[in-house]
């Protein structure tokens, strides 16, 4: 009984993990796009996409802050430099937000 329960819980855990939306999946599905601010923004506003955007942007904020601190720069400047690179590196078919605030498909 315990073994069966453990196997069921393991299978459920793998299913949840496999179903978790990744940044690459969201980009490919047109659910998120890169912005010049250095952060991703949602294109679709479902709960799964919004949770991903929050997680990714929190991690980026932490990373930008560390870079800013080590280089004695404002965090906004670091984020904008990263944003320019991320927008430029977006793959064909992915969305980026232009300086006019509109989504463009590369």
Question: Where would I find each of the regions flagged by the language model?
Answer:
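Classic N-terminal secretory signal peptides
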Residues: 1-18
């Amino acid at each position: 009984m315990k073994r069966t329960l453990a196997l069921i819980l393991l299978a459920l855990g793998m299913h949840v993990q496999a179903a978790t939306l990744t940044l690459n999946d969201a980009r490919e599905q047109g659910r998120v796009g890169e912005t010049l601010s250095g952060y991703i923004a949602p294109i679709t506003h479902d709960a799964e996409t919004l949770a991903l955007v929050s997680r990714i942007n929190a991690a980026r904020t932490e990373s930008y802050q560390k870079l800013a601190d080590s280089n004695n720069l404002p965090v906004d400047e670091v984020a904008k430099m990263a944003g320019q690179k991320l927008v430029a590196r977006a793959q064909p078919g992915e969305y980026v937000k232009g300086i006019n605030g509109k989504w463009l498909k590369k």
